[in-house]
Amino acid sequence: MVVNMTKDKFYKIVLYLKDLINGTKFEGKTYVVGGAVRDLYMDKEIKDIDIVVELPSGGIEFANWMEENGHTHGNVVTYPTYGTAMFHLKEYPEVEIECVQTRKEQYKDKNSRNPETEYGTLYEDAMRRDLSINSLFLNISTNQIVDCCGGLNDIKNHVIRVTSTPEIVYEEDGLRILRCVRFFSRFHAENKDWHIDENTLKGMRDKVDRLSIITKERIADELNKMLMCDDPVCAMRLLVDIGAMRYVIPELCNLVGLEQNKYHSDDAWGHTLNVLNLVAKRPFYGAAELEVRMAALLHDIGKPHVKSVDDKGRVHFYGHELAGADIVEIILRRLKYSNDFINEVKFLVENHMRTKQWGDTCEHMKDKTLRKLQYQCGYARFFELLTLIDADNKSHAIDHCLPNQVYMINKFTNRMVDDNTDMFDYKLPINGDDVMFIKGIKPGRDVKDCLEYAMKLAYNNPKITKTELLKHIKGYDILPSLK
């Protein structure tokens, strides 16, 4: 698969394939289909090439023919159950082609989104797809676009519309509801004229319960793509609007209309969307962008569980970040995310309030406190957390938004890095063996207590030497309660 393939390269590949199949049974029967044709027509870069062959078993036969005639790079991989095959082109080894026969589908089991498939016509293949804009075919031999469902007109008019009757489309496969949300959000971010066809939107609402049979992994996959689009807020709003959020992350529904305190100008859901919007708009240079966006979406998920109102009628959410971290784990495990992903998002949510008391210009921050955060985060995670904190700060009411805080944290951090007093990669120069030797104690809680004391000394002075630390440890009185 090629990411961001230029139109010029795409046409070179199409012409290459055209010359190969000229005079064979595949001539006039082989089409590029789906997103590549849509993006070609919309003058966008193309991400992958999917091919359909309008012949029985055409996909596998075409792939095998390519291999037998020396046109593939590496081996062809076939999936006979689904009639599909995958291979890389010899002339363009970085390009992966997925090919399949044109198919028609029957959904006989209402509790499954896996249809029975068999060979079908080009029109039947188009009608089995979800959206008209994804149901376009480019004939490789003639270079003509075949449009069975009005997709070209829908692109011109910026319309997201299903290929046939919405109720049938979504009854057959509820995942199409989430795909529709994703495509709308993606294109609406680029051009606000994009909209969902009225009947298509009604069908999404009417058949939203079909999401109940979709596997959590597929839901998570669509959620990831929504979060990583240019306007994830559009997708999240639409999920709530059509009732789909209760099948994706139902806990988020509890934020809608949740009254907040004077520090906020929106309800908890509006605030969450503002934070997500700011995170999505910010340039990101790390590897954990999805984790940060997920943390933005879930950072206040604990608020409904800890809400309290004092005797003056003021609303409080004490400890919501701690409650939220526990709920984050429940949500992400349910959606089958990896342990590493869960731990990253949990950490960000649990610590997003960490700097609130430092003040707008960090006037209440101590160097040792900043170093402790650096040490506990590590370099990459530190700046991921600051991204979330900055978005959260700036989404508060104007008088409480701490607009300069993260800028000042970065300024102090840069100073520490310059004079080698930061603690991103700090390693304590003593260990448990050193402590046991100098104190004459055995392994246990006392050793841990001494090492924690040593870390406190290091937070104050990261250049402290092993000799100095051991001198302090030798004179350190271990509390009796810790023995």
What are these regions (language model features)?
Residues 1-483:
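Catalytic cores of the polymerase beta-like nucleotidyltransferase superfamily
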